[in-house]
């Protein structure tokens, strides 16, 4: 799914980033910034210790002040936009892959919500890339060729359903 999205962004070019999606009126640039931000978070949490807390605290502080997630990610992005954002996001995709490919799948990692296993964390990254990727394809009026590669996403949806009611 990451490759599909990367190929689409490269084909459309950085100009497509200003396109508004149907998800909360986020632009494609907002979406890619969001994916980039939390890819970095996924790498930081795998490091253990205070790495994740140090990453997430400034974002959470903004959320506590009433900022939206997009507004909270702006200081973290520090002016990274356009093609550089696409490139930095893609590097973060590769960093997540490299970090998790040999990780103990049962290792517990911190996150904004409850801790989860490394296996669940990487599945969550896959799920988020798939879902936000679909929103980008839809915003650009493009069809995405679906393949039988989302079993883990469906599994995550089933096991996480109960957690979805915690924040209501």
For the regions a language model picked out, list residue spans one by one:
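Amphipathic alpha-helix face/heptad-repeat signature
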Residues: 1, 31, 85-92, 121-128
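Generic alpha-helical secondary structure signal
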Residues: 3, 15, 83-87, 94, ...
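A generic secondary-structure signal for well-formed alpha-helical elements
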Residues: 2, 9-12, 35, 39-46, ...
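Structured surface interface patches that mediate subunit assembly and partner/cofactor docking
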Residues: 47-59, 80, 102-166
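Active-site-proximal cofactor/substrate-binding loop regions of enzyme domains
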Residues: 20-44
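Conserved small/polar residues in nucleotide/adenosyl-binding loops
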Residues: 34, 166-168
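Short, helix-capping/interhelical loops that line the mouth of catalytic, cofactor-
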Residues: 40-97, 101
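Helix-loop segments that flank and shape redox-cofactor active sites
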Residues: 6-27, 48, 52, 99-116
